[in-house]
Regions:
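Cytosolic, membrane-interface loops and tails of multi-pass inner-membrane proteins
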Residues: 16-40, 93-120, 214-237, 284-293
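Multi-pass membrane catalytic core of lipid/isoprenoid biosynthesis enzymes
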Residues: 78-85, 101-152, 226-266, 270, ...
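Small-residue-rich segments of transmembrane alpha-helices in multi-pass membrane proteins
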Residues: 55-64, 114, 175-189, 235, ...
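Extended hydrophobic alpha-helices typical of membrane-associated regions
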Residues: 37-40, 253, 257-318
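Membrane-embedded alpha-helical segments that form the functional core of polytopic membrane enzymes
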Residues: 58-99, 109, 133-141, 148-160, ...
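Structural signal for the C-terminal ends of transmembrane alpha-helices
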Residues: 65-70, 163-164, 189, 316-318
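Intramembrane alpha-helical segments
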Residues: 43-44, 113-196, 200, 257, ...
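Membrane-interface helix starts
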Residues: 47-57
Length: 318
């Protein structure tokens, strides 16, 4: 029996060589603009426009890497730390804004942040934080086992800090531990142990961070009182300048003792002397507790960290 022949499928017409697909350029332009705006909001979320947090994280790490490495830190380790500082600072900004998303709209200085202004959704912020956390984890896995353990503890410090200021008046000291945690990590990675000098440096950074973050909190003191955020600026009250001065002296003393432990000489001491001058200038800035001046004093701490590092590096060079 003959099978019934089916009609052949229709041939596709030949493509016209002059044919050009209609991509609707105006739609592509709109999509590109929307993507650009979104990326700009993400950049604002991780504070790319305000690198002060990167510097304040970087200088303690550089102090530790130079001392632990006797002035010659491993280049690969240095790159890992620099990348880790950027990633962890970015992640810290994201989780801080997520934790404060209901408080920031009620504070003058923070009400225009992407999460507070609802230009970035909470889910987007969490996704960005997870991505940054995965990158930080990968970087930590390049370190020795002991350094990895310290890195894990540092991650826990960074994640828990934003919620602490709701319950205690001393979150600035906790922030100092988080910002200085790269110090024991550096010694663990380079020497395989965490000696006494590492804890002296960490103590100095905790005190220094309490200094500059109290100045930062002085900017928002009135709003923080209204919305219920706790800080050392509120706890210290009218004694804020005196207590800041005491902590500045104690931070310099801890750095001096660390220098003795590392047998550092004149260049390092000169760096500390220059740092003391910046502390005096900061005291002058905050004399009237004017918010803009307090914010300038906070930013000025970058130069304190810089001159201490320059003195340290020159000491190993000469």
């Amino acid at each position: 029996m003959n099978a019934e022949l089916l009609p052949a499928p229709p041939r596709k017409p030949r493509r016209d060589p002059k044919y050009k697909p209609d991509f609707k350029p105006h739609n592509l332009r709109d999509a590109a603009l929307a993507l650009g705006r979104t990326l700009c909001e993400y950049a604002l979320l991780i504070r790319l426009h305000r690198p002060i947090g990167i510097w304040l994280l970087m200088w303690p790490a550089m102090w530790a890497l130079w001392i632990a490495g006797q002035g010659r830190p491993d280049q690969k380790l240095l790159l890992i730390y620099l990348a880790g500082i950027f990633v962890m600072r970015s992640a810290g900004c994201v989780i801080n804004d997520y934790a404060d998303r209901d408080f920031d709209p009620r504070v003058e200085r923070t009400r225009d942040r992407p999460l507070a202004a609802r230009r970035v959704a909470s889910g987007e912020a969490i996704a960005i934080f997870i991505v940054l956390g995965l990158i930080a984890t990968w970087l930590a896995m390049q370190l020795d086992p002991l350094a990895r353990l310290y890195a894990a503890a540092g991650g826990l410090l960074a994640v828990t800090y934003p919620w602490l200021k709701r319950y205690v008046y001393l979150p600035q000291f906790y922030l100092g531990v988080a910002f200085g945690w790269s110090i024991p990590m550096a010694f663990a990675a380079i020497t395989g142990e965490v000696p006494r000098i590492a804890w002296l440096l960490l103590a100095a950074v905790v005190l220094w961070a309490a200094v500059y973050d109290t100045m930062y909190a002085m900017v928002d003191r009135r709003d923080d009182l209204r919305v219920g955020i706790k800080s050392t600026a509120i706890l210290f009250g009218d004694a804020d300048r005196v207590i800041i001065g005491v902590m500045q002296v104690m931070a310099l003393l801890a750095l001096w003792l660390a220098g003795d432990e590392a047998e550092l000489g004149l260049w390092y001491r000169s760096g500390l002397a220059a740092g003391a001058m910046f502390f005096v200038y900061q005291q002058w800035l905050i004399r009237d507790r004017e918010p803009d001046a307090c914010f300038r004093a906070f930013n000025n701490n970058h130069y304190f960290g810089l001159v201490v590092f320059v003195g340290l590096a020159l000491d190993y060079l000469y």
